[in-house]
């Protein structure tokens, strides 16, 4: 029960555990909402692990970051590659993080560098290892270095 109470406090107040201790409300909104990719709210998406109502008016809130990575895995693999046929990091990032809100070139270049390929090379997101690395790199661009590759891998495993 104390763990549940602490989880509610973290979610509601935006308490972020950092190496230097606890800071109230200083973590990025995606961290406060357990949404490492800042996935936008959409009434049509009934994600497993989704918290309703969201603590953020624009972005989804998840019970744990692994559920946010899970949603990202499904979004990239099933929608972006499966439905839309996006084959490169550049194509995926330009849809996920459009240039009217982001520096999409820098975003795509960073993600590609983390995967060791060019941003305009085809990428196979049916590979769990590749998908987890991509999601982890995207989380760094979205919220900073708050999450581990292992958390992204768990989200992919759950997808």
Language-model features, listed with the residues they occupy:
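Membrane-penetrating hydrophobic segments
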Residues: 1-9
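Cell-wall polysaccharide-cleaving catalytic domain and substrate-binding groove, primarily
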Residues: 11-159
């Amino acid at each position: 029960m104390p763990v549940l109470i602490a989880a509610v406090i973290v979610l509601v107040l935006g308490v972020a555990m950092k190496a230097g201790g606890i800071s109230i409300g200083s973590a990025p909104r995606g961290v406060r909402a357990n949404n490492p990719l800042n996935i936008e709210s959409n009434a049509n998406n009934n994600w497993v692990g989704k918290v309703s109502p969201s603590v953020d008016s624009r972005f989804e809130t998840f019970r744990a970051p692994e559920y946010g990575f899970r949603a990202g895995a499904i979004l990239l693999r099933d929608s972006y590659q499966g439905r839309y046929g996006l084959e490169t990091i550049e194509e995926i990032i330009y849809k996920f993080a459009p240039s009217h809100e982001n520096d999409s070139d820098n975003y795509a270049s960073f993600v590609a560098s983390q995967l060791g390929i060019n941003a305009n090379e085809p990428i196979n997101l049916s590979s769990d290892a590749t998908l987890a690395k991509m999601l982890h790199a995207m989380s760094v661009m979205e919220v900073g270095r708050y999450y581990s590759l292992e958390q992204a891998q768990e989200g992919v495993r759950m997808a």
